[in-house]
Amino acid sequence: MTAKSAAAAARATVYGYPRQGRGRELKKAIEGYWKGRLDADALRTTATGLRRDTWQQLAEAGIHEVPTGDFSYYDHVLDTSVMVGAIPARHRAAVEADALDGYFAMARGTQDVAPLEMTKWFDTNYHYLVPELGPDTVFSTDSAKQVAELGEALALGLTARPVLVGPVTYLLLAKPAPGVAADFDPLTLLDRLLPVYAEVLADLRAAGAEWVQLDEPALVQDRTPAELNAAERAYRVLGGLTDRPKLLVASYFDRLGDALPVLAEAPVEGLALDFAEGAAANLDALAAVGGLPGKRLVAGVVDGRNIWVNDLEKSLALLGTLLGLADRVDVAASCSLLHVPLDAAAERDIAPQVLRWLAFARQKTAEIVTLAKGLGHGTDAIAAQLAANRADLVSRADSALTRDPAVRSRTAATTDADARRSGPYPERAAAQRARLGLPLLPTTTIGSFPQTAELRTARADLRAGRIDSAGYEERIRAEIGEVISFQEKAGLDVLVHGEAERNDMVQYFAERLTGYLTTQHGWVQSYGTRYVRPPVLAGDISRPEPMTVPWTTYAQSLTDRPVKGMLTGPVTMLAWSFVRDDQPLGETARQVALALRDEVGDLEAAGTSVIQVDEPALRETLPLRAADRPAYLAWATEAFRLTTGGVRPDTQIHTHMCYAEFGDIVQAIDDLDADVISLEAARSHMQVARELAEHAYPREAGPGVYDIHSPRVPGVDETAALLRKGLEAIPAERLWVNPDCGLKTRGWPETRASLENLVAAARTVRAEHAGS
C-alpha cells in the first residue's frame, strides 16, 4: 500500500476507556452490592448500561472500532486470571460457590482468606491484582466474559475489537504462589498458557471478532534474551493458528526497544506503538526494521496519561512520517484512556480559557478522530480544529498562571547545602531518642483514619453553605479529639491527628498551593471502587500560608505523646497529579519541594517533633527502562531532601511508601536520608524487610504488619508472626510497628480491632525480646 492509500485508510480507535460512568455509577453499584443494598442482577444491569453508553458515545464521536473486554468490576488482570483459570487454591471453593462473590473475595479478601497481592500497573496510578502461579498451576479456559461483552457491542451494530492482556505480559506480571519457591519463573508456564489463549481467540472469532487486541506493555521494559524469545514463541504460535481473528499486539507506556523487531517479524496482522512516551525511539526502530509491510500500525500519538490538549499539528507531522512504514496507519491514544478523567466539559469551577487547555477522555477521543480525519483527508478538512488548537496552545504558553518570577528566582538560588540534613544519622538518632523517649518496637499509624459519612457530610455542608467555616472547623476538631483519644487508649506510641480535614492526600495540598487547579469531576480509578481526583499542576508553585500547622498543633495540645506532622512529598505531589508538560519534571519538583520546606519549618517552629513526608510514589514513578532511572532518582531524592533539609537534628523525619517492589530503589531510599521509613509489606510477607537488610539499610524502618486494603482484621498471633519475620531482617532497636498504609478507606470497627491487635502484638514481641 502506498503512503497515500495508507493515509486514506486511516481510522480512529482507542485501546480502552474509563469504566466508572459519568456519576461513578459503577462504584456506587458495586459498593451497594457489597453492602447488600443491590443484588447481582441489579449490578449486572448497571454494568451493561455503562458499557452500552460508552460504546455508543465512542461510535458517535467517530471511533471506527470500539474496544470490548476492557470493562471490569475490579481489575482487568484479575479478569485475565479468571479467563485462564488461574484461581488460587484458597479461593477456589468461593469461586465455585458463587463466581461473582468469589471474584470479589480474590480482590478484597475475606475475614479468613487473604486476597491477591495488589501493586501498581507499571508506572501508572492504577493497581492490579498480581496473579499467583506455580509449577503445579493448571490453566483452563473461561472466555464467557470476553465473548458476552463482544456480543453486546455487535448487537448494537458496532465494529468491535476485544482487548486481552497478552500472555507474555500476564506471566511477567505474575509472582510465585504462596508455598512456591521464590525463584520460580512464571514464564516457564508459557507453553501451558498458549493453548488457553488459542481457545479464547477461537471463541472470539466464532462470536464475530475480526480483530483482537493483545496488550503487551511488559515488553517496553528491559527484557532478557529469554524473555524476548518467549515473546517470539508466543506470537509465532498464536499467529500460526488458523482458527483465530486478526491480531493487534499493543505496547504502551514507553518505547518498545528490542521487542520491536521480534513483533515486527511475528505472523500477526498489526502492531500498536506509543508515540507519546517513546516517539523518537519507536520511529527510529520502525525505520531500522524496514517498517511493517503488510501490517496495520496503530499510532498512539495522543497522550493517554496526561490531560493537556494535544498539539495537533505536531501529531499530524509525526503521523505523516509513519505513512509508508505500514500497510495502514490508524490513530489512537498512547494507551488506554482508563488513566484520565471522563469529560472536561463537566468542570464548572475552572475558568473557560484554562479549560480549553485540558483534554479528558472525551476530548482526547475527539482529538484522535480529528487527527484520523486530517491524516485521511488532508489539513483542509480539519482547518477549523487546527486553528482553535493553535490558539489554545498559545494561550497556555503566554498565561501568567504558568510563570511566577519570584518562584523561579528562589528555585534558581537553591544550593546543595539546602538539600542536606544537619549532622549524620547516628548523631540525629541519639538526639531523637533523647527527645522522644520511645519504647523498643514503637507503634504508630501511617496518617489517615477512617473518613466517616459524618466527615463527608460536613464537607458537603460547607460547600453547600449549610454550615460556615467555624461550624466546619468545630466538627473537624471533634473528630481529631476522638482520634487522639482512641490512639491513647489503644496504646499507640506516636500518634497522628487522623487527617479528618483532608479529602485526599494530594488534593488537600493542591487546593492550598498557588499554581494548582482542582477538579470537581476528574475521577480516575486507582483500584476496584477506589477513585481519586488528581489535581492539575498547571503553573509555578508557591505556598501562600501554612497548610497543616493549626490542625497538628491542636492535636498535640490534646496529648503528651508525640503527634506526627503529616505532609505529602514533592514526588508524590507530582506523581498523583496531572503535571505541566512544558518544563522538566525536576524543575517542577524543586518548586513543590520549596513550598513544602516552608511548611516543614513552620511545623518544627510550632513544636512538632516528628514530621512525616509521604513519598508512596517514589518507586511507582520510576522509569520503566533502567537507562532512564539515574536521572529521575537524582532529582526525586534531591527534592525530598530539599523539603526536609532545614530541620534540627532532634526532629525526626519519617517517610512512607506503599504498593511497590522496592529492591531496585533501596539505594534511593537510603539517599532520602529520612530517619524512619514505613513501607507496605503485609501482602508480600515482609519481602521489603529482607530487601532493606540485603542492602544494609542503616536507619529505622516500619514494614507494615497488616494489610489495610482488605476489610479483614488480622489477629494478634498473625500480626506478631509478621513482626517476628521483620525482626529476622531488621534489629529491634530500629524496627517500628505500623499498618501498611493510611486507614482512610476502612471502617471504624475494623480499624479499632486491627490497631488494638497491632499494639498487643507489639507488646507480645517486645516482651519476648526483653526476656531473650
Curated annotation (Swiss-Prot):
Residues reported in the UniProt entry to bind L-homocysteine: I446, G447, S448, E499, D614
Residue numbers binding Zn(2+): H656, C658, E680, C741
Residues that coordinate or bind L-methionine: I446, G447, S448, E499, D614
GO molecular function annotations of the record: 5-methyltetrahydropteroyltriglutamate-homocysteine S-methyltransferase activity; zinc ion binding
Record keywords: Amino-acid biosynthesis, Metal-binding, Methionine biosynthesis, Methyltransferase, Repeat, Transferase, Zinc
Pfam assignment, any one: Meth_synt_2
EC number(s) stated in the UniProt entry for this protein: 2.1.1.14
Keyword Transferase: yes
Pathway: Amino-acid biosynthesis; L-methionine biosynthesis via de novo pathway; L-methionine from L-homocysteine (MetE route): step 1/1
Keyword ATP-binding: no
GO biological process: methionine biosynthetic process; methylation
Catalytic activity: 5-methyltetrahydropteroyltri-L-glutamate + L-homocysteine = tetrahydropteroyltri-L-glutamate + L-methionine
Gene3D superfamilies (UniProt xref): 3.20.20.210
Cofactor note: Binds 1 zinc ion per subunit.
Region (Disordered): 404-428
InterPro entries (UniProt xref): Cbl-indep_Met_Synth_N (IPR013215), Cobalamin-indep_Met_synthase (IPR006276), Met_Synth_C/arc (IPR002629), UROD/MetE-like_sf (IPR038071)
Active site: H709
Superkingdom of origin: Bacteria
Cofactor: Zn(2+)
Positions with a binding annotation for 5-methyltetrahydropteroyltri-L-glutamate: R24, E25, L26, K27, K120, W576, E620
CDD domains in UniProt: CIMS_C_terminal_like, CIMS_N_terminal_like
Enzyme class per UniProt: transferase
Function per UniProt: Catalyzes the transfer of a methyl group from 5-methyltetrahydrofolate to homocysteine resulting in methionine formation.
Family statement: Belongs to the vitamin-B12 independent methionine synthase family.
The protein's name in its UniProt record: 5-methyltetrahydropteroyltriglutamate--homocysteine methyltransferase
